[in-house]
Design a protein with these regions (language model features):
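Active-site-proximal beta-strand/loop segments in catalytic clefts of secreted hydrolases
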Residues: 66-70, 95-99, 132-136, 153-154, ...
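Structural microenvironment flanking redox-active thiols in thiol-disulfide oxidoreductases
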Residues: 74-120, 136-140
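Short active-site neighborhood of thiol/selenol oxidoreductases, capturing the structured segment around
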Residues: 52-77, 93
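N-terminal "domain-start" segment that seeds a small globular fold
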Residues: 22-55
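Loop/turn elements at helix/coil->beta-strand transitions in domains of secreted/extracellular proteins
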Residues: 59-64, 88-93, 126-128, 145-147, ...
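Thiol-/selenol-based redox modules, centered on thioredoxin-like
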Residues: 145-183
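Secretory targeting signatures
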Residues: 1-32
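Short, internal strand/loop/helix patches
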Residues: 110-154
Length: 183
């Protein structure tokens, strides 16, 4: 019985590896995905604030998509705040690849907002970030790790994608945001 419990514990810890630990760099932080399509898939989802957002609604605007999960805290939330601190108030869609989570999108957004708070003093509130389901979009794109970040340009084309360790760099965020906004 002890061996079975140990095996379950080890398997559980492997499932959460990379989403609860330190900010260590991934082995290959530049995207290692099979073949990423050139265009981001069409999507239409209900967000944490009860509004519908879609690729059609964002047509003509660049935006960023962070594929995450409600249980992914440290690296995913650090990434969210790096993006906010670099280019605040831009449209960022935080898409959950976990369709079975018991954590609501609203609670997830509140938790991400509070991630960088100093005690009772709130810092950033990620007001232009929308938290929504994105498991189908993640499957279409072959996303396998939380924190995968995709920059989408004004015409819906993917201009850059990578893991959270690569995207968690202010210079890269600014450079890729500028590229996504080129005409």
């Amino acid at each position: 019985m002890r061996c079975k419990m140990f095996a379950v514990l080890v398997a559980s810890s492997l499932f959460l590896a990379g989403c609860t630990g330190d900010k260590e760099e991934d082995e290959d932080s530049s995207a290692s995905y099979s073949e990423m399509p050139e265009t981001f898939p069409q999507w239409d989802e209900l967000t944490d604030d009860g509004t519908n957002w879609s690729s059609t609604r964002l047509d003509g605007q660049a935006y960023i998509v962070i594929f995450s999960a409600q249980w992914c805290n440290l690296p995913c939330m650090d990434l969210m705040h790096t993006i906010w601190n670099t280019v605040p108030e831009i449209p960022v869609m935080v898409m959950s690849t976990d369709n079975g989570s018991e954590i609501s999108f609203e609670d997830w957004h509140d938790s991400a907002d509070a991630h960088d708070d100093d005690g009772d003093e709130p810092n950033n509130n990620l007001t232009s970030f929308r938290f929504l389901l994105g498991d189908e979009e993640g499957n279409v794109l072959g996303i396998e790790s939380p924190g995968t970040t995709v920059f989408v340009n004004k015409t819906g084309d993917i201009t850059w994608y990578g893991k959270s360790s690569a995207a968690n760099d202010a210079d890269l965020v600014m450079e890729q945001w500028d590229i996504a906004n080129q005409d």
